[in-house]
Every structure is written in C-alpha cells, then in structure tokens.
Curated annotation (Swiss-Prot):
Gene Ontology BP term (one): protein transport
Chief subcellular location: Golgi
Keywords noted in UniProt: Golgi apparatus, Membrane, Protein transport, Transport
Official protein name in the record: Conserved oligomeric Golgi complex subunit 6
Biased composition (Acidic residues): 693-706
GO CC terms in record: Golgi membrane; Golgi transport complex
Family: Belongs to the COG6 family.
Region Disordered, annotated ranges: 1-35, 686-706
Function noted in UniProt: Acts as a component of the peripheral membrane COG complex that is involved in intra-Golgi protein trafficking. COG is located at the cis-Golgi, and regulates tethering of retrograde intra-Golgi vesicles and possibly a number of other membrane trafficking events.
Length: 739
C-alpha cells in the first residue's frame, strides 16, 4: 500500500488564503454597516484568541515548517490547499485500510483452516487419551510399587549390613581353628554392637525379630568369649613375663575378656597358680641351685644360712626384687593401655548385677588394688617358703641383738611391701607376723637369761665396790647395741614425737631387755645390811642405767622419769647420811640434841629460857671445850673425809652436789648453835661484858690486866663463864674451812 504525507511539503504553494486576507466584495454582501459590525466582531474574535494555546502554537509551528510565504494568493488558497491535503491523506488512509481488510480476510481464512485442523487433532487426542489412560494408570502403579520395593530393599540391605553377621565372620569369631587376631576383635565388636542395638528392636514393633537376633548374638558372644578364654589360658602357659615385648594381642584379649568378670576371674586364678608355681621354683633355685646356672659369682642364698641377718636379708631382697619385677610385668600386661581394662571390668560388673553380694551396694573396680592382690597371689608359695625358713633360722639362734636386727629388717621390708602391694596384702601380713614371731623369740631369750641369772646367787651378790652388778652391765651393753640398731633403722621416731607420747616402738624392747635385769639389780641390794651402802649401790645401778639410755630419746621417754625420781629419793638418803656424818664427826650433834627444846620453832622464848642453856650438861665448860676441840680437829679434813665417805658412788658430780648440800645443811645447824650460844650469853648478861672486854682488850696495851679483873668481877657477881669464849668458832669460819 502506497504511503504518502498527509500535508504538502514546506514551500509548496497553498490555495488557502490567510484568515486576515481581505475578502472580495460581492454584490450579494450585506450592507456596509453590517460589514463594519462583522469586521468588528471578527477583529474582536481574533484579538480574543490566546496564541499561548498549545494547539495554536503547534499550528503555527506546522505552518512555519511548510515555508509558506505571506502573499494574497497563498492566503486565499491556504484553506483549500489544506483541505485538499486532508482529503488526499484520508484517501490514502482508506486505501491502506482496504489493503488491511484484504489481509485480514486472508488471515481469517487461515485461522478457520487452523481451527478445523485443531478440532481434528483434538478428536485424535481424545481418542488417544482414551486408549492410553489405562496404560498410564498401570504404569503409575508400577512406579509406586517400584519405589516401595527399592525402599524396602534399601532397608533390608541396611538391616542386613547392621544386624546380620555373615557366616565367614561367625566362623572367624567362634571357630577354634581360626586364630585370635584383629579380625576376631573386629567381628566381636560388631556382634556386641548388634546385641546392644537389638534393644531398639525390642522397644519397637519388631519384638520377635529383636528377640531372635539378640538370642543369636548372645550365643555368638558366649562362644567367642569361651574361645578367647581358652586361648588366653593357653597363652598363659607359655607366657614369659620377663620378656619386655609382651604380645599386644594378649593384652587386648585380656581387656575384652574383662567384660566377662567370671571368665576373667577364672583366667586370673589360673594365671596366679601358674605364676605361683614359676616363682616358687625360681625362689627354690635362688636358695639352693644358683651355682648350677653357670654364674659362679652368684652363690645360693643357703650359703649364708649361718648368718641369720644376711640370710633373711638376702631372701627378703630376692622377694622384693621379684615383687617389683612381677608388678611391673603385670602393669605392662594389664594396665599398659590406660584404664581400658578397668572400664571393661566395670562394664562387666554392671552387666552382671546378680554377681553382687549386696544388691544395694554399687561395685566399683579398683585397678591398683586388683593388681596388688594379683601380685600377692602370685607370691603365695614364695611367702609360705619364706615364712618356714625365717622361723626356722630364728628359732636356731639365741643372740638377742641379731634377733632385734632381724626385727628391724622385717619392719623395714614390711613398710616397703605395704607401699608396694598394700598394707593388707599377704606379704605385708606375713612380714608383720614374722616380726611378731621374732619379737616373741627375742623376749623368750631375755626371759631365759633373766631366769638363769635369778638362780645364780653369786651373780646377784653386789660387788665389793658397790658398783652396778656385772649382769646389769652385760644387759646394758646388749641394750646399747639394740638402741643403736633402732636409731639407725627406718622406724626410728622423731624425738619431738617420742617426748609427747610415752609409748613407742622401742618400749616393748625396753620391757624385755632392761626392766627384768634392772629389777634383779635393785632386788640384790637387799643383801646389803648398811643403809648407806645400799643407797650407794642403788645409786650406782640407777646412774649406770640412766647414762646408758640418756642419748636415746625413744628410751628416755618411757624410762628416764622413773629413774630420775628414784635417783632423787636416793640422793636425799645420801644427803641425810652425809649430814649425819658431819654432825657426828664434828661433835655438833651433841649440842643440837641438847638444844632440841630450844629449836627454831621456840625462838620466841624468854631470856630466862635462853639463860638456862648454860645449865645444860653439854654446855658446861669442860664438855663445851671438848666439843670445840673435836670441831677444830674435824674441820681441816672435813670436806675430804665427807667426799671420801661417798667415793664408791660412780659419779663425781653426784658426790660433789650431795656433799655440798650436806655441808650447807651442817653450816645452817652450826649457825643455829652459834645463835643459841650468843643468845644464852646475852640472856645472862655475859655477852655484853665479853663485848666490853673485847673492845677494851682491843684498845688496851695487850697486857690482859683488865680482862682478868673483869673475869673476877663477873665471878663475884655469880654470872658464870661466857659460852662464846668456850666455843669461839663462827659460821663464817666454818663456811670458809668447808668450802
């Protein structure tokens, strides 16, 4: 369809004249007045038009684009030209629409043809659908069935893979011909997992299936554990614990078997019996057959049987070394992989509640205790042989020091074994019993020795020098060796501890090795008739005993206090004896006896009473002069004689202190006598005269005339002689002479 512009091109001439062109006059035009009005109206209309309107503006723009020249012709033809262009455009449009209509007709015929074709195809489709619907329905059902079958197959495969053990695996698990290896443990772990997972089936709708699978897995597990149990027993027969490279398979087998406590305990019993036999044989070999092994440097322990301490020490050292080696080997065998074995045993205990003795008590497995118990059981035969030999060798020796050294040795090893295998183990209990047995034998030896001494009267007689008897010296020598042994032993107590608590480990030894001999020594003092000799003898016994035990706090804590108390009593007796000796030898005792009524308790007596002292027989001139002379003869050697009086006391310090206190008591007695004499003179008025005489004599020329005259004067007055002049010694002089 031809196309064209509905408007003439710019610059084309237009037949339409402009609106403001002057219209031509016509004879038919209205009158002039009307034309004027029309023109006025036209102008008004033109002037009233707003050229700001968009339509006007567009029209003007279009007109401007056409390139129209403002001429009269153009203005006249403008409207016609425009209308002609409009008509031409409309004609062109009509032609185009005609073409469109023709094309639409052709399209309509095509659409009709397509509609008929579609209807025909729809009919065929309906017929095909009617034919294929049953097939599709059947195919859909088959697809659903296929999906269900595939799901069931996957479930079956998963169930079979998880819950069903193949025949090959069961054969490896239960057949005796098959070895115990990693495959066995893998299958066993899988069967145990199946057995545990069957509980989930029991809780669901598949109870019967769960029961069947659980029963089957239980039978398989029981067969597997029985196979493992027999294999471990077989391995135990040829197991060498001394081999540092113990098979890891047997360790794993033990950890697995631990989940069956009854089977595991039976295996341990079998193992303990086997090890007991092996270790007993090794102990017997070490005792008797060491030389036959080819090493001439190693001699049998029996070679030192004559020396109980070395013999028992060698046996205990062998047992200790064997125990340490056995424990290390068992730790490698049972505890090397951490606490897996303990976990297995604990799981087995929890799975067998019927094996508990007390249902309310929850059993907890202690691995270290079980290991110590097993080591003790392995050494039962060795312990039995050790006990027999120790008891035999102890019974054959009567040396108390050796017995006590054996006691300390047993105590030392008892402490070691208590730490190594536990305080309640067989070895610790055995050593405790042997220690008690040896102590009883030691006490028996001491009792026999005491009985022998008690029947020997010559041994009980006190020596002439009143020193401690020989049997006491011998017993103290033995006691010293015992105390040195105890001090050097492991069980010696801290002095601070023994000072707080009297009883200690050494107290029974003191009761057996010291007390009976000490009692005999004290009893033998009864044969001495002289009290002073008896006191000296007992003092020597106590001093000797005290000096022996003093360096050892564990002995002094129990026995020093009674010894010190008795020595204090004996010291008082010897002090009184020395005091009496000084008084009797010096003659002062006569004056003290005479002055007894005028003792210090009666110091408040009147002068008349004190004056009566001069009338006492002991204070008469001759008697008082004799006493004064005796005192003068005594004083030069008094201290030496008094010290010599206690020369048989075997402690110079003790003798010195006793003598010094006796001298001090003597000086106090002399001071009392001196005071009474001065008091008597003063009461009689003689003391003042004597004082005057002394003063005058000191001031005179020394010819004594005044003194004689004074005496005559006194005699004439009847006052008597001055006691002070008859007994001139002073307390100061006595102290100086006896110092």
């Amino acid at each position: 369809m031809a196309t064209g512009s509905y408007f003439p091109p710019p610059g084309a001439p237009s037949s339409i004249s402009p609106r403001n062109s002057t219209p031509a006059l016509s004879p038919l035009s209205p009158p002039l007045q009307q034309r004027s009005n029309a023109l006025s109206n036209r102008l008004t209309s033109v002037l009233s038009v707003s050229y700001a309107d968009s339509d006007i503006r567009d029209a003007l723009e279009t007109l401007s684009l056409r390139g129209v020249h403002n001429t009269a012709e153009v203005r006249r033809q403008l409207r016609l030209d425009v209308q002609k262009e409009v008509v031409d455009c409309n004609a062109e449009i009509v032609r185009d629409f005609g073409n469109v209509a023709e094309q639409l007709k052709r399209i309509g015929s095509v659409i009709s043809s397509l509609k008929e074709t579609c209807d025909e195809m729809r009919k065929h489709i309906v017929l095909a659908k009617q034919d294929t619907t049953p097939v599709l329905e059947e195919a859909s059902a088959l697809m659903i069935q296929k999906q269900e079958a595939e799901t069931k197959q996957r479930l079956l495969d998963a169930f079979t893979k998880h819950f069903i053990v193949s025949e090959e695996e069961l054969l490896a698990l239960t057949s005796i011909e098959e070895p115990i290896d990693d495959e066995f443990f893998d299958v066993l772990a899988r069967v145990k997992q199946v057995h545990r997972d069957c509980e989930a089936l029991l809780g669901a709708e598949h109870e019967r299936l769960g029961l069947e699978l659980m029963e089957k897995s239980s039978r398989s597990l029981n067969s597997a554990y029985q196979k493992l149990y027999r294999w471990i027993q077989k391995e135990f027969k040829s197991l060498n614990l001394e081999d540092p490279q113990i098979s890891g398979t047997i360790r794993q087998a033990l950890r697995v078997l631990a989940e069956r406590p009854s089977l595991f305990q039976t295996c341990l019993d079998f193992f303990a019996e086997a090890r007991d036999y092996v270790l007993s044989d090794a102990f017997h070999y070490a005792l008797t057959d060491a030389v036959s092994g080819g090493d001439s440097a190693v001699k049998p322990i029996e070679f030192s049987a004559h020396d109980p301490l070395r013999y028992i020490g060698d046996m205990l050292a062998w047992v200790h070394s064997t125990t340490v080696s056995e424990r290390e080997a068992l730790e490698t065998l049972f505890v090397a992989e951490g606490d897996e074995l303990a976990k297995g045993i604990q799981a087995g205990l929890n799975s067998e509640p019927w094996s508990r003795i007390d249902e309310d008590e929850e059993m907890t497995f202690d691995g270290q205790k079980a290991l110590s118990d097993l080591v003790s059981r392995d050494l039962i035969g060795v312990a039995r042989s050790l006990r027999q030999r120790v008891e035999l060798v102890i019974q054959g020796h009567d040396d108390p020091v050796t017995c006590y050294k054996v006691i300390n040795l047993l105590s030392f090893y008892q402490t070691i074994f208590s730490k190594l295998v536990g305080p309640n183990s067989n070895l610790a209990e055995l050593l405790k019993a042997l220690e008690k047995f040896t102590l009883n034998h030691f006490q028996t030896i001491m009792r026999d020795e005491v009985n022998n001494i008690s029947t020997d009267h010559s041994a009980l007689a006190p020596p002439d020098d009143l020193s401690a008897p020989q049997f006491l010296h011998d017993s103290l020598e033995v006691l010293t060796a015992l105390m040195k042994t105890h001090e050097a032993s492991l069980g010696t107590e801290d002095p601070s501890i023994t000072s707080e608590s009297e009883e200690n480990e050494f107290t029974p030894v003191l009761h057996a090795a010291l007390d009976p001999f000490f009692t005999l020594a004290k009893a033998s003092a009864d044969e001495l008739p002289d009290p002073t000799a008896r006191a000296i003898y007992l003092t020597n016994v106590h001093i000797t005993t005290r000096s022996t035990i003093s360096p050892y706090p564990f002995a002094t804590s129990t026995h020093l206090p009674p010894l010190s108390a008795t020595l204090s009593t004996l010291r008082v007796e010897l002090l009184e004896s020395q005091h009496r000796y000084l008084l009797d030898t010096s003659g002062l005792q006569v004056l003290l006896t005479a002055l007894q009524p005028f003792s210090q308790s009666n110091e408040s007596g009147t002068e008349k009473d004190l004056a009566a002292i001069a009338d006492l027989p002991a204070f008469q001139a001759e008697a008082l002069i004799s006493t004064s002379q005796q005192l003068d003869d005594f004083l030069p050697s008094a201290l030496m004689d008094a010290t010599d009086n206690l020369k048989r006391v075997q402690s110079a310090t003790f003798v010195k202190s006793v003598t010094e206190e006796a001298v001090e008591a003597f000086c106090r007695d002399f001071e009392f006598v001196e005071g009474m004499i001065i008091g008597a003179d003063e009461a009689r008025g003689v003391g003042q005269s004597d004082g005057a005489v002394n003063e005058e004599g000191e001031e005179g020329d020394g010819d004594g005339d005044g003194e004689v005259e004074l005496e005559l004067e006194v005699e004439q007055r009847g006052q008597g002689q001055s006691l002070r002049k008859l007994f001139p010694r002073t307390t100061g002089e006595i102290r100086v002479l006896l110092s």
